[in-house]
Amino acid sequence: MGACLTLSFSCDEVVNQISQGLCINVGYICELSKNVVAMKKDMEVLKKKRDDVKRRVDIEEFTRRRERLSQVQGWLTNVSTVENKFNELLTTNDAELQRLCLFGFCSKNVKMSYLYGKRVVLMLKEIESLSSQGDFDTVTLATPIARIEEMPIQPTIVGQETMLERVWTRLTEDGDEIVGLYGMGGVGKTTLLTRINNKFSEKCSGFGVVIWVVVSKSPDIHRIQGDIGKRLDLGGEEWDNVNENQRALDIYNVLGKQKFVLLLDDIWEKVNLEVLGVPYPSRQNGCKVVFTTRSRDVCGRMRVDDPMEVSCLEPNEAWELFQMKVGENTLKGHPDIPELARKVAGKCCGLPLALNVIGETMACKRMVQEWRNAIDVLSSYAAEFPGMEQILPILKYSYDNLNKEQVKPCFLYCSLFPEDYRMEKERLIDYWICEGFIDENESRERALSQGYEIIGILVRACLLLEEAINKEQVKMHDVVREMALWIASDLGEHKERCIVQVGVGLREVPKVKNWSSVRRMSLMENEIEILSGSPECLELTTLFLQKNDSLLHISDEFFRCIPMLVVLDLSGNSSLRKLPNQISKLVSLRYLDLSWTYIKRLPVGLQELKKLRYLRLDYMKRLKSISGISNISSLRKLQLLQSKMSLDMSLVEELQLLEHLEVLNISIKSSLVVEKLLNAPRLVKCLQILVLRGVQEESSGVLTLPDMDNLNKVIIRKCGMCEIKIERKTLSLSSNRSPKTQFLHNLSTVHISSCDGLKDLTWLLFAPNLTSLEVLDSELVEGIINQEKAMTMSGIIPFQKLESLRLHNLAMLRSIYWQPLSFPCLKTIHITKCPELRKLPLDSEIAIRDEELVIKYQEEEWLERVEWDNEATRLRFLPFFKFFGPEWQVSYVR
């Protein structure tokens, strides 16, 4: 064993010697542990600072329409890079620390420890540098306002292309400053507005900003200003707390410096742009406002004279949309499904909301039975169909928004009629008066005015649809009708309160669990044969039984326990020949319609109905007598048109005993009766519709008409008079006044046919509100207005309200009027078989509504013979002539 050698030296000296020899920084090794701890600590500080900065950036970008500064983004990127490098260093940290020896002052692998220590020191410096750079006073910069923010929209849209282009033309070419889009709920107004919004991003329109705001019911000015403010980068916590006046000023200052488009979706009342701070659009500032609403009234209050209606889809478009929603696989699931699917789609009547919801509901139904059941449910009580909870409440908003409570029951009443049923406005008003919706103690004129106002409200709210051809009729969209029935049954809770089973093939009155709860019942257009039994309908006020062609018999007991019945309509029951005397038990009855029945005599019990106000007896081809009618003391309106029995001398006497009579619509076949009626001032005042058929004048051949302020319609067929004149005393002059020139101021419709003695209709000068004139098959008529006769009545310009003129088979007709007329309301002229009529009273200078005018003719040779005052007139009106071939037939008024 050899001797030991002991050497004594310090570790520092060894390391120093090595470092001097290698020219390295020994601190990388000696201070590695300390530097790693410092690096970790500083990195945690940096990450917290990074998180704080990022949070500030996110908040400002999200809530205040700002964009992060480039230096902030660069710093965040650098921090991310450093963090990755830091994490990489930490992966070998434990191994490097284990490599140290001599209490951390030396390393088992000096080179490796040196290099790692150097990286730690450099990382520490980089972290410290980034941390010092991360103290930002501001982290974002306000961004320029985006010109347009595109809205999400469903990929499949059907049937809006034409409407979209029309609206776009209004905005960009026609110069309309405010465009109103109105239509019923679920028709696609919001979708259309969304497409308009997105179209601005496709087109270079020159607008600085396009703003979208959803308004909804009960507009919240503060919220709407807030939505506009956010779009204009005015929003923020501080601005949110500013009062509305200051916010309006801020909005005005921004919008007043640029062209803008404001899109307001779903407005229910006038939106005051001034209160919002929105400059009013004008041609000078070039700004636009487009809004959607369910009410045409709102369009008027927004100062839009010509709003654009968004209508339901056409049948082919509706079917296309429905197919998309159902899917090809389902439609091909069975050969019968496509035909059934068309019927289901038809129940939606082109309403996109219903087509979408019902189509999606049926998308997985691949059994024929499921489709048949769907048709059955939609036909009987659609509210129970799956998905209707997504449709009916949306439509109900329009009902809820009816401000007058009086209007709501009138609307619900319209649901008693069949689908797509055309309701006569005045008949509807008569129902409402009898039901008590309109005060029956008002004068007839005032009650009618209220009724027409209610109809107008419902039409403008898109809850009723006005007929395009016959303005005196309205109808209800089928889905809106289902909504009304749902409401009438207390949202489905009390279905028996309002029973409507129309056109479903009933052969008897339906079974009802609780007759005492029934208030209204409509069984129109069925096949009921007998009304028997004695149902205790103590609350029933309305019973519609129209057009049950098989109805033969009503038992004596049927009316015994219906004491509250107000309206009974039995019209159109062509097999019904008798009414029971027990009708006298209907002590509350105010309205009775027996038109188009085969009843020969009115029951004696009818005379006991002391509250009966309205009695209609039209087209009763076997009616022989209504004697005793004077005993119906409360009668206010009697209608006896085109029945076997017409007005006779004794009936004139009876009618004069009816003290409360206000309206008389009557047919007459005798000249003596005409004379007697026209000499009964109180009855003349009641005349509203006068039909003369087969009246042959027995004296002078002149029909002299007195002043008839309420006369609305005149039909003269196969009569022998050679002239119609106005009573002389009507035209007499007083010492201070000129002749009266408007003694038929309510007359709107005149139909004359097969009157071979008449040569002219100059008396029509005194009908200033005439809208429809038909003259047919009268071989001696030479002119509508005779110039010589008219010259004695200077200052009267005829036909200022005329909309429709029909002239047919008038062999001698040479002139309508001897000089051009303005015809400001004229829409259609029908001329057939009038070979001598060579000239129409038209002139190129008159302001006629030529965008609607149609001039129909049937003979090409007639058009070739038409004479024009000048070439300008010919060029203007020739495009409005439309040829109708021999298949076109003239329709005659019954």
UniProtKB/Swiss-Prot annotation:
Coiled-coil residue spans: 31-71
GO molecular function: ADP binding; ATP binding
Alphabetical UniProt keywords: ATP-binding, Coiled coil, Leucine-rich repeat, Nucleotide-binding, Plant defense, Repeat
Domain NB-ARC: from-to ranges: 140-443
LRR repeats mapped onto the chain: 517-538, 539-561, 564-586, 588-610, 611-633, 634-656, 660-681
UniProt record, GO biological process: defense response
Residue pairs linked by disulfide bridges in the UniProt entry: none
Function: Disease resistance protein that mediates defense responses against the bacterial pathogen Pseudomonas syringae pv tomato strain DC3000, and the virulent oomycete Hyaloperonospora arabidopsidis isolate Noco2. Becomes active when the MEKK1-MKK1-MKK2-MPK4 kinase cascade is disrupted by the microbial effector hopAI1. Does not seem to be required for the activation of MPK4 by flg22, or flg22-induced up-regulation of PAD3. Functions downstream of MEKK2/SUMM1 in immune responses, including cell death and defense responses.
Assembly and oligomerization: Interacts with PAT1.
Protein name from the UniProt record: Disease resistance protein SUMM2
Source species: Arabidopsis thaliana (Mouse-ear cress)
Gene: SUMM2
